[in-house]
Each structure stands twice: as C-alpha cells, then as structure tokens.
C-alpha cells in the first residue's frame, strides 16, 4: 500500500496568550528555557542528581519529610489514577467526598479498580461537612480509604482539612488528597495533618507545562502498598516499581520525561527563591483584591469567602450575558483565556485562575479592564474605574 506524502506544512501558528483560566497557567520564561537544555539519558548520573534535587524541592513545596516523594509521568489525572490504582483492592470499601466534578472523577477511578464506593456529598460551591463524613465513617467502619479534593477546580472551593484528617486517622483509615489546584498557591499541610497520599499537577500554581504529577506518600501508606496482597493492576503507575527508580536502586521502570523534569526543577527553584510562605501570602493578597473588584462590578461569587480558593475564583455571569461570548471576546480582542463552568455550573459561571506568575497586580488589572469591556459589549454596564480602584485598595 502506498501512502500519499503530506504537503510541506506551514510554520506552526502560536502566539503569546495570558492564561488566566483553571489551567494550564503561563510558565515562567526560565522554565521554558530549562526545557530546551541538552537531553540526557534517564540513568545518566547528572540526570539522577537533578531527580534527587527535584525530590527535595517537592518535599519543600509539599511541606513534608516523606522520602516517597516524586514526579509521576503524566498530568494531575495520572496522579489521581496512581493514587487509587496503588491503594484499592477489588471489593474494598472506599469513602469518596464529592463536592464538585473532580470528586466525582475520584468515584469513577476508584470504581474502575473494583472499589465499593461510599459517597459523601455536598452541593457544588460548598465544602464537605465533617459531620457528614463522620456519619459515613461510623456507618462504614470497614472502609480503608477516604479520598477528598483539597482545591475543587470546578467550583473554587478550598476544603478545610483539619477536622477531616482527624476523623480519618481516628478511624484508622488512609487519607488520599487531591491538591492539583492548591500546591504552590496555598498551604498543603501534608505532614502537619498526616495526609497519606497527596498528588498534584505541574501546570497550575507551579507554572510549569503539563506533563508531570507531583506525588508524595506517607511511610505507613508506602508500607501498605509494598505489602499489598496482589500486584497493582496498572503496570505503568505501579509505585512499587517507580519508587525504586526514584530511590537508591535506580531500577529502570520507564524512560523519564527528561526535559519536563528540567522544567519542574526550575519552577521549584523559582518557588524556593520567593519562599513558599511568601508565595502563599501573595496568592491570598491578590485574590482578595480581585474578589473586591468583581463585587464592585456587580458579580456574585460562587463560594462563600471563608471557603474560597485564592488560586481559582468563580463568579456567576450576570443575567442576560452569554458567558461563552465573554470568553470569546477576551480571547479575540485581548488574547486572554478564562474558563467556563463544568457539570451543573456549565454556562452559568466563569473560572479565573490567579496562579503563580499570574497572581500579580499587573495581570489582574489587565484582566479586570478586559472583563469590563467584554461585559459592556453585551450590554452589561460596570464601572471599570471603580473596579480597578478596588484592586489597589
């Protein structure tokens, strides 16, 4: 069989855009330069040293001493898959807290590995009520795992974790935590609250291209995985093998994403230079200013202030405004990307990411002015001067 040779392709058409949606976020220029450094072999001593350094930097960002800390190949969804692939046995009872689309996704993933899933639910835009979890634990004392989303990307809810963690550990269960939209933007208290497995993604508050899933595992969780009675059903995400590659053995399991690891290493160096606590405070300070600007514009925010995530803000679009047309206007005129709603909030809200380098006064000013213009184009009038003034208060 003869195949037609493709025509000479034109140059790729890409342009700089301001990514202020739910992710990916813009990467720092230093991170992009790091990706272009010379390729090394995945067992080259120089690359193994970069892996070691990256692990230590991840421990700093996760605020943990867990030795089982690594960057899994794949996006944040691979982190979720790894968490449940390694911990779930067929027929095991797993409690999953669902307060948005990504909690729902947890139930799907756990079910595919044979879990009997018990759902603890709250409405989208609200956190999980510890009393509801306590009830589920009491009714299901044989459950082994509790899974929860720390930062629900579909709603912008930051889940309070102190009571949740205590309930889980008092019951002798393992706690699996999704921190895809919180790591690097808000405190992720892995050791303080004894999270057993915590995973994230590189493309949000870490300001790195998508492709790796930072993951950290407690000692007791690691021992359980090591001694599980049956092999992990997902060969590629089997932590028993991957841990040996990231550990002293340097056991070959897969070819690591070499240049993505360079990028993550550089992104984590930038965080270290700023200081993790300074970074958290910057996200909080800028988010509060942006919330004030939105309220000045007449926007109703989805989440009650005490449960808002600083790295992702959600608001209802005004009556009579087509939210998709607003997003298209921002992209066409300003090259700014923001997100729409998911699930039951589709068509009703916008999701705006203030992540890493994009959590800055200059970028919030540009976005706020552009939003006022986009709303005005649909006949919704807001006081742009007042909104911009609110950013500086």
Where are these regions (language model features)?
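A glycine-/small-polar-enriched, mobile loop at the entrance of the PLP active site in fold-type I
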Residues: 16-72, 77
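Conserved beta-loop-alpha segment that forms the PLP phosphate-binding cup at the N-terminus of a helix
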Residues: 55-58, 65-95, 99, 103-108
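Active-site C-terminal subdomain of aminotransferase-like
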Residues: 26-27, 203-292, 296
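Active-site phosphate-binding strand-loop segment of PLP-dependent enzymes
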Residues: 127-184, 197, 205
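PLP-dependent enzyme catalytic core of the Aspartate aminotransferase-like
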Residues: 344, 348-393
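Conserved PLP-binding catalytic core of the aspartate aminotransferase-like
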Residues: 300-333
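Conserved active-site segment immediately N-terminal to the catalytic lysine
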Residues: 191-203
């Amino acid at each position: 069989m003869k195949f037609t040779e493709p025509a000479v392709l034109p140059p790729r058409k890409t342009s700089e855009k301001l990514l202020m949606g739910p992710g990916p976020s813009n990467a720092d220029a230093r991170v992009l330069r790091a990706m272009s450094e010379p390729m090394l072999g995945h067992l080259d001593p120089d690359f193994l040293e970069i892996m070691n350094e990256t692990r230590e930097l991840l421990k700093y960002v996760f605020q943990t001493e867990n030795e089982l800390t690594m960057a899994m190949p794949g996006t944040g969804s691979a982190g979720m898959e790894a968490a449940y692939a390694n911990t779930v046995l067929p027929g095991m009872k797993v409690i999953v807290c669902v307060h948005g689309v990504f909690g729902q996704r947890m139930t799907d993933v756990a079910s595919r590995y044979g879990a009997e899933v018990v759902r603890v639910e709250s409405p989208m835009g609200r956190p999980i009520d510890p009393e509801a979890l306590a009830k589920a634990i009491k009714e299901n004392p044989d459950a082994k795992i509790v899974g929860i989303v720390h930062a629900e990307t579909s709603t912008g809810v930051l889940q309070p974790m102190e009571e949740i963690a205590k309930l889980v550990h008092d019951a002798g269960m393992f706690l699996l935590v999704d921190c895809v939209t919180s790591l690097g933007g808000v405190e992720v208290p892995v050791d303080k609250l004894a999270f057993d497995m915590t995973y994230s993604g590189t493309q949000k508050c870490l300001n790195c291209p998508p492709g790796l899933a930072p993951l950290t595992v407690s000692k007791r969780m690691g021992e359980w995985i090591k001694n599980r009675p049956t092999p992990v059903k997902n060969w590629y995400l089997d932590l028993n093998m991957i841990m040996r590659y990231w550990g002293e053995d340097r056991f070959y399991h897969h070819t690591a994403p070499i240049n993505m690891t360079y990028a993550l290493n550089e992104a984590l160096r930038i965080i270290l230079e700023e200081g993790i606590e300074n970074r958290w405070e910057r996200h909080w300070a800028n988010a509060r200013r942006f919330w004030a600007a939105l309220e000045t514009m007449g926007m109703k925010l989805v989440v009650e202030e005490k449960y808002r995530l600083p790295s992702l803000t959600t608001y209802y679009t005004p009556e009579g405004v087509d939210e998709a047309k607003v997003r298209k206007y921002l992209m066409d005129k300003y090259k700014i990307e923001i997100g729409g709603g998911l699930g039951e909030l589709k068509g009703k809200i916008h999701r705006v990411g203030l992540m890493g380098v994009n959590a800055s006064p200059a970028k919030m000013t540009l976005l706020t002015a552009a939003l006022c213009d986009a709303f005005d184009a649909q006949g919704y009038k807001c006081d742009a001067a007042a909104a911009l003034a609110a950013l500086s208060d």
